[in-house]
């Protein structure tokens, strides 16, 4: 049995919900939005600021000079000086450390945040990419956005952002199938997809080819 699972997902694919089901079925820790709070606590910044930098590159917040000081640091990460500011790179560095620590503890499901890249050479980690038909993704996204929003452009933009985030911070191609043990369509149903992933983890080889 693998000791950790990473789930990368297209926006609106239901990958987060599938990850949640798996964590409940296995009794494992789910690291998704909770990572944002852990980063904020480690950096001693407002969780809302950490949320805005989650899975993104430096945005308009950085360009207009948002100056939120990083006043704390995780053990093993050098503390910053008064001249340093919390930004996307800081967010990613702290997230990477939290992912590595979670892997050491084991029994965790890591959603997004480049987990498949951070842990790609660990033989005891199972990597999954969740995708969905375009129509399903649009339907899910429509339920999250305000009326009148350009849903299709929002989803495309989100895909571009995640692709660029993984490329810039981890040097990986987010959509490269070679990063994953399994690609799963949520069209199968979230419960079925979760069960298939767990079964593959339990039956599959412990070492990656």
In which residue ranges do the predicted regions lie?
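Glycine-rich phosphate-binding P-loop
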Residues: 6-23
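ATP-dependent small-molecule kinase phosphotransfer cores
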Residues: 40-107
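Short beta-strand-centered segment that lines the nucleotide-binding/catalytic pocket of NTP-utilizing
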Residues: 29-41
């Amino acid at each position: 049995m693998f000791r950790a699972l990473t789930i990368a997902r297209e926006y609106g694919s239901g990958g987060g919900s599938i990850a949640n089901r798996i964590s409940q079925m296995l009794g494992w820790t789910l690291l998704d939005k909770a990572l944002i709070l852990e980063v904020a606590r480690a950096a001693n910044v407002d969780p809302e600021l950490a949320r805005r930098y989650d899975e993104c590159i430096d945005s308009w917040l950085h360009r207009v000079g948002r100056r939120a000081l990083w006043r704390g640091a995780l053990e093993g990460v050098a503390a910053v000086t008064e001249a340093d500011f919390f930004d996307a790179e800081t967010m990613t560095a702290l997230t990477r450390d939290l992912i590595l620590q979670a892997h050491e503890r084991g029994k965790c499901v890591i959603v997004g945040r480049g987990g498949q890249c951070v842990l790609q050479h660990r033989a005891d980690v199972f990597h999954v990419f969740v995708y969905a038909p375009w129509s399903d993704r649009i339907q899910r996204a429509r339920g999250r956005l305000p009326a009148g929003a350009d849903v299709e452009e929002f989803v495309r933009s989100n895909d571009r952002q995640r692709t660029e985030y993984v490329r810039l911070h981890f040097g990986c191609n987010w959509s490269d199938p070679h990063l994953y043990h399994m690609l799963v369509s949520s069209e199968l149903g979230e419960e079925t997809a979760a069960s298939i992933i767990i079964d593959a983890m339990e039956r599959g080889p412990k070492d990656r080819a």
